[in-house]
Amino acid sequence: MKPQPLLLIAIALLCCCVTDEGDKITSLGKIADESIVYVWWSVKAEDRVYLGLGTVDGTSFAEFHPPNRLEILLSSEDFSQREAAVWDGEEILIFGGTVFENGKYSPTDQILSFNPKLERLRVLNASLPHPTSDVAAVWGDSRVYIFLNNSERCEVYAFYPSNESFAKLDVSCPIEHPGGCVHSVVWYGGKAYFFCGEGVASFDPMGGFKWIAFTDRVWVRAATVADGYIFAIGGSSGIAETKDEIIRFNPKTGELCEMRTKLPVARGQAVAVGGEYIYIFGGYTKDGYANEILRYDYRGDKCVNFIQLLNDDVKKYRPNNGKQ
């Protein structure tokens, strides 16, 4: 990648409140002044959010300052789709993805590192076990847990940034396509939680995966942690079947419920970060990719549809409509 000169563009985001009094979602305006914007990833670093953006001109790295300022830190003419990103406390690490080379798109085994303070982008000497775009990653226990597809079989690796080394874990991994969970995995309380595929699952580095609930097959949800809960937003069970639902999960009690508020437009492939509010960036809708930032007041919302877990092993779920 050959970065262009640094762009410092402060974008004022206009607040356009929704008209439904019962809705808790506010539109903060455009992500960028572009005809098409793809949001490849988001990571939270203390009080700031970093985003990987794709446009017709290439790739940009942006910094979002809640509540309403976005700044482009670095732009490149590189055309690539890299979505598996984590924050390691100092840098953003980005794993695999798809790159445009020699007139075609191909999977890559590259690991990129972006330092927002130094505005420096580099390719690490280490690389994934094989080129793939079917990959998800999460930061936990001072390492990166990487879930990738190897010949239709999910494998789990631990990556240690301090010495750029890998260790393959001897654990189960029932996720069919980790890349479909790339924005749907979060770390909380010593475990990774997945909200994709056949339902909700937890991953313990020592014990592997455990299904918590089986739901409809939904991919590309946006998941984030906020106030001790995990929220899963939108998703898709097919390109034409995007979701507008917001689901809240309590990892301490196992309570799973659907929130009253719906997305103003159904979408999958969005990214989300939690804090005082949950910020939702981009996503794919029936009208194409959404060039929009949404702010969700989750504390002002409430559950209207609790999902009743049937037994300790949890093989199915049953909506319990009307339970408050």
Curated annotation (Swiss-Prot):
Keywords: Kelch repeat, Repeat. Signal peptide: none annotated. It comes from the Archaea. The keyword Transport does not apply. Disulfide bonds: none annotated. Kelch repeats lie at residues 229-276, 277-323. InterPro entries: Kelch-typ_b-propeller (IPR015915), Kelch_1 (IPR006652). The keyword Repeat applies. Pfam families: Kelch_1 (PF01344). This is Kelch domain-containing protein AF_2170. It comes from Archaeoglobus fulgidus (strain ATCC 49558 / DSM 4304 / JCM 9628 / NBRC 100126 / VC-16). The lineage of its organism: Archaea, Methanobacteriati, Methanobacteriota, Archaeoglobi, Archaeoglobales.
